[in-house]
């Protein structure tokens, strides 16, 4: 999928546009988090997070792409000398329905759970020195004993300062590099290869359609991106245009796309994942249980899942998106700034454009 077209001009536009879209002093109605996250240093770059339900209602919290996830996902942001250290782990797209009970943690009011993880595993801290670690975002929830995501809660942590031993951190980061150098698949064959190739191929016209709809603005755009501002519309359209270019070829481009999981990341609840630092995308077995294109508004399918993953990779359009919220209800609760940085906002908007939702 290596595209011959340079995206330097787009990158420059994106950086400038994102910086000007939302004032840094923007306030949200939900500034008080339902989940409190207490970060403490265990040893070296090993960190403990204690997640507590601050509210007065029971919560059933999804652990995928959150604390307690065993995959190398982004749980915290790491800052060095005032700048965020690039995240080098994986970004997962998981199911929004049919989820297994074991991926949820139930928290009653005042109850907590703990998680320990090494921040040097997914961030290059080899330069050493003082870093600041913090977490803020949204966690997906479902009704108690449910298997379909139905809500979202805001979480926020304290700021944790750590003095890092660069040599020790480099060894931890090297373990991720070793993890990422396992034998790769040489290609896509059989029914899965055909399904993936078709989905990638059809991602191109759908992304182009979404780009046109974004430029025109309207109800669906405002629903997902919380504004009809022309600058924001152009920025969203530019990312969709880049996805359309990347998906237009399965033999050249800026990303490497695998039909199956070469790194052992997949689980029954994960559809696909991206390794943005290497511009790698991989489907999971659950991807192939999806329909090619759904006829259900806000639903998941193979084509929009591929679009979701393409938006993560900075080789397609920089900066790549994050995973801030999953599903229609959570994605439409985001601010403009957050939606511009949320992969599911793009895939759900493409679904809305295709079906006229």
Curated annotation (Swiss-Prot):
It is found in: Secreted. It comes from the Eukaryota. Its cofactor is Zn(2+). Transmembrane segments: none annotated. GO terms for biological process: proteolysis. Binds 1 zinc ion per subunit. Pfam families: Peptidase_M35. PROSITE patterns: ZINC_PROTEASE. Residues 1-19 form the signal peptide. The active site is at 309. The keyword Transmembrane does not apply. Zn(2+) binds at residues 308, 312, 323. Its EC number is 3.4.24.39. Residues 20-182 form a propeptide. It is an enzyme of class 3 (hydrolase). GO terms for cellular component: extracellular region. Disulfide bonds join 188-259, 266-284. It catalyses: Preferential cleavage of bonds with hydrophobic residues in P1'. Also 3-Asn-|-Gln-4 and 8-Gly-|-Ser-9 bonds in insulin B chain. CDD domains: M35_deuterolysin_like (cd11008). Belongs to the peptidase M35 family. Secreted metalloproteinase that allows assimilation of proteinaceous substrates. Shows high activities on basic nuclear substrates such as histone and protamine. This is Neutral protease 2 homolog BDBG_03102.
């Amino acid at each position: 999928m290596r595209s011959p077209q340079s995206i330097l001009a787009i990158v420059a536009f994106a950086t400038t546009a994102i910086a000007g879209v939302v004032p840094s002093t923007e306030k949200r109605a939900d500034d008080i988090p339902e989940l409190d996250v207490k970060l403490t240093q265990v040893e070296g770059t090993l960190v403990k997070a204690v997640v507590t339900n601050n509210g007065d209602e029971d919560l059933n919290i999804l652990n995928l792409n959150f604390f307690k996830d065993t995959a190398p996902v982004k749980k915290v942001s790491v800052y060095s000398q005032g700048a965020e250290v690039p995240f080098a782990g994986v970004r997962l797209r998981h199911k929004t329905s049919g989820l297994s009970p074991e991926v949820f943690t139930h928290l009653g009011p005042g109850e907590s759970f703990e998680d320990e993880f090494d921040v040097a595993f997914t961030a290059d801290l080899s330069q050493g020195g003082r870093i600041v670690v913090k977490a803020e975002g949204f966690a997906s929830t479902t009704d108690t004993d449910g298997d379909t995501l139905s809500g979202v809660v805001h979480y926020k942590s304290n700021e944790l300062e750590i003095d890092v031993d660069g040599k020790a951190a480099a060894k931890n980061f090297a373990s991720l590099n070793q993890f990422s150098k396992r034998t790769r698949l040489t290609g896509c064959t059989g029914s899965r290869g055909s399904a993936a190739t078709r989905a990638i191929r059809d991602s191109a016209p759908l992304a182009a359609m979404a780009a046109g709809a974004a430029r025109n603005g309207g109800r669906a755009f405002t629903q997902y991106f919380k504004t009809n501002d022309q600058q924001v519309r152009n920025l969203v359209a530019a990312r969709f245009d880049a996805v359309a270019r990347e998906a237009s070829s399965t033999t050249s481009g800026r990303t490497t796309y695998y039909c199956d999981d070469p790194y052992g990341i997949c689980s029954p609840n994960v559809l696909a994942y991206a390794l943005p630092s290497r511009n790698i995308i991989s489907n999971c077995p659950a991807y192939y249980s999806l329909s090619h294109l759904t006829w259900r508004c806000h639903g998941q399918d193979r084509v929009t899942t591929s679009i979701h993953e393409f938006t993560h990779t900075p080789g397609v359009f920089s900066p790549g998106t994050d995973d801030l919220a999953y599903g229609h209800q959570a994605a439409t609760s985001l601010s403009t700034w957050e939606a511009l940085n949320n992969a599911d906002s793009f895939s759900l908007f493409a679904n809305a454009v295709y079906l006229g939702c």
